[in-house]
Amino acid sequence: MQGGVGRYCKKLVDSLKNEGMQVFVVCNKDGKGDFNGISPNNQDNSKVLLKIVKEVEPDVVHVQYEHGLYGIHLDPLNPRKTHTNIESFYDECTVPIVTTFHSAYTFTQWMRLVVPLKNKLFGPLGTWIKMAYDYWTHLLNYESFNSLNRKKITSNKAGVVFSKYLAKIIPGSTLIYHGAEPSTSPPLNRNEARRMFSLPERENIALAVGFMTATKGWDIIGRMKVPDGWKVVVNTSRNHYGREKLRDKFENKGVINLNRGFLSDRDLSLLFYCADALILPYKVTSGSGVMYDGLAHGL
């Protein structure tokens, strides 16, 4: 997949291969892995994974665990029935599993995940009813969501997190900080990098990049009063795994929207070199690969 989890996984795979390990990657039909077949909409994800494990006979299975990537179902009546489409894989797999957790939330942040989704068929009433339903299912399932994480750390199952925040919420996990490094070396001159994106050379630039989702705070950027001498440069990418349909237009003279979608590692690195600062207006976050990328580029 494109985006943060995909890049994190690719960097890990490349590092393991550099150490002489044989690595097989399982992804969805659009990915470039060795096997495919998993998706948020496939209720048989566990069967797909168990079949591959039987065929490959690995020493260790590593799962990039972002719940929505495998299909998460919050039961509105019985929280014990809340699950993802890979729970039975964890129950039945006899090979040791290492899970990298990408999401865990405090109760306040968990409830902030509920965002209004416009209902074209029933209008404002439909939007309100859907919001009420989502609030109820989130309120009912906060503990069951956390238990999905906790159940994945047992005697032959280990968990990895990349921030102290996640480590506190997922007890028993091992903290390994999220790595990052520039994809262009040596560093490019800032003005030279800006010319490649047709960005102003005499103003300070605050950079905001990431998925076009409501919890990333793009609406905050649209309302910002940008100080003189500064521009906020935005580059969003489509979220293929959510239902949100957000406007990607920023009616703010202090905001420059590149509107280039997903960037290659090289182009993303060049974009970081354009910036004087990184802006993260997140409303909800468990961790931020963008933040680590920014640190790697001296921001």
What are these regions (language model features)?
Residues 1-32, 56, 91-95, 149-154, ...:
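N-terminal subdomain of nucleotide-sugar transferases
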Residues 52-81, 96-100:
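Short N-terminal targeting/anchoring amphipathic segment
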